[in-house]
A protein has these predicted regions:
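Structured, non-membrane catalytic/scaffold regions adjacent to prosthetic-group chemistry
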Residues: 38-408
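N-terminal secretory signal peptides
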Residues: 1-17, 28
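A generic secondary-structure boundary signal that marks alpha-helix termini
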Residues: 27-28, 179
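Cleavable N-terminal signal peptides
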Residues: 24-25, 35
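N-terminal signal peptide c-region/cleavage motif recognized by signal peptidases
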Residues: 31-32
């Protein structure tokens, strides 16, 4: 039954009255600014909300930050993220000589060597080619730290991030210059002060390699190689050379500084593993993790897994320190050479224990224990360490990094 209202009564403000109120408030300088509007209000229906901004911002209640490791890197806050995409401003950084600031109008990319037509491309030239977009992770080959119990997932392996990348296929560029059939390697050279250079085997990467000029729908950020970087899905991050300025095709590797004094794995028998480009399967539990404290009862174990070999097929969870394993649930979609999110429902009985995860990829590769890695490679390498990691849980619910598991 509809109640009657007095003649002339209207609910709220008319459009004209609302406009007068808004303009009057603006003239008096009493409109709430963006900072004020973002302050939590007991009743958001009783005050004006924030007006549109030229640039969006996070809620003040959310404060994810990269951890800084000056002067060369910063780490992604894995424990603070949802889904599988990393916001551009939280993507990890790794530099050899700081950021290169490149004028896009002056940008040039030289492609030469074993080609029919050596060419120099501008940024506009590159953007004229058919564009492709794909989602994949990047990971530094030195992405492991685990010497203290008071260590977060961000510190353990925060040198990995995942982005939607847009650019042109490397195969398109090589076709444009007429790459010779005998060309089996190419040199990628950056425009930073270190003149970062890597030799890349063409056959192994050509099907997926890109020249990327955008990430997550916007131009590359300077720390990610603006205006153009090489992108090699599944390959150690340093080979995806940023601020790309030159590619030279050859029939042999170039043996640069970065693949002799660095990024080569010395082995226990005195030999070395060179051009170990692919990042093997890995996982990390992001919650519960240090510095959390949990309570007895239901706990959801969450984390991410990835493999440079392709798809993550499964993630296994142990809640008894690795004695028994059970399958976690993978959040769909699971993409090749991409972070996959997993979860596992657990009833904690309140007794001290250790929770552990391990990934298995589509090739059957199983993420190894640190003892197996040390047995195969010795102790002189810090690259490509992807050991099984976990978290100890004390009787009072305090969570700490299981440092003894990786102290081999």
């Amino acid at each position: 039954m509809r109640k009657t209202r007095p003649a002339g009564h209207r609910d709220g403000l008319t459009r004209r009255a609302l406009l007068r109120t808004t303009l009057g408030a603006a003239a008096l300088g009493v409109m709430p600014d963006a900072t004020q509007a973002q302050e939590p209000s007991p009743d958001t229906t009783k005050r004006w909300g924030r007006l549109p901004n030229a640039l969006g911002a996070r809620s003040p209640a959310e404060n994810p930050r990269r951890t800084l490791n000056p002067p060369t890197s910063s780490r992604t806050p894995l424990q603070d993220l949802q889904g599988t995409l990393t916001p551009s401003d939280l993507h990890y950084e790794r530099h050899h000589s700081g950021l290169a600031v490149v004028d896009p109008r002056a940008y040039r990319l030289l492609v030469h060597g074993m080609v029919d037509r050596p060419l120099t491309f501008t940024l506009d030239d590159i953007k004229r080619f058919p564009a492709v977009t794909r989602t994949c992770f990047l990971e530094c080959s030195g992405n492991f730290f685990g010497t203290r119990e008071e260590t977060t997932p961000q510190d353990v392996c925060g040198l990995t991030s995942q982005t939607e990348w847009t650019g042109v296929m490397l195969s398109t560029i090589f076709s444009e210059v007429g790459a010779h059939a005998g060309a089996t390697w190419f040199l990628a050279e950056g425009q930073d002060a270190a003149v970062m250079t890597r030799s890349i085997p063409i056959k192994e990467v050509l099907g997926e390699a890109m020249l990327a000029y955008a990430q997550n729908g916007e131009a590359l950020r300077p720390e990610q190689g603006y205006p153009v970087r090489l992108l090699l899905p599944g390959v150690e991050g340093n080979a995806s050379v940023k601020w790309l300025r030159r590619m030279k095709l050859s029939d042999r590797p170039f043996m640069t500084r970065e693949e002799t004094s660095k990024y080569t794995d010395p082995l226990a028998d005195g030999t070395a593993r060179q051009f170990s480009l692919v990042m093997d399967a890995r996982s990390v539990i992001t919650s519960p993790a240090y510095p959390e404290t949990i309570e007895k009862g239901f706990v959801e174990i969450r984390g991410i897994a990835w493999s440079g070999r392709g798809l993550v097929r499964r993630v296994e969870i142990s809640t008894d320190g690795g004695r028994t394993w059970k399958a976690a649930t993978l959040q769909q979609p699971v993409l090749p050479k991409a972070h996959a999110r997993f979860r596992y429902a657990w009833q904690w009985d309140g007794r001290p224990t250790e929770i552990v995860s391990r990934a298995v990829d589509e090739t059957g590769y199983v993420q190894p224990e640190m003892s197996a890695l040390r047995s195969a490679r010795g102790r002189r390498t810090r690259y490509h360490l992807n050991p099984v990691t976990g978290w100890t849980i004390a009787a009072d619910g305090r969570v700490r990094f299981a440092v003894e598991r990786v102290r081999v």
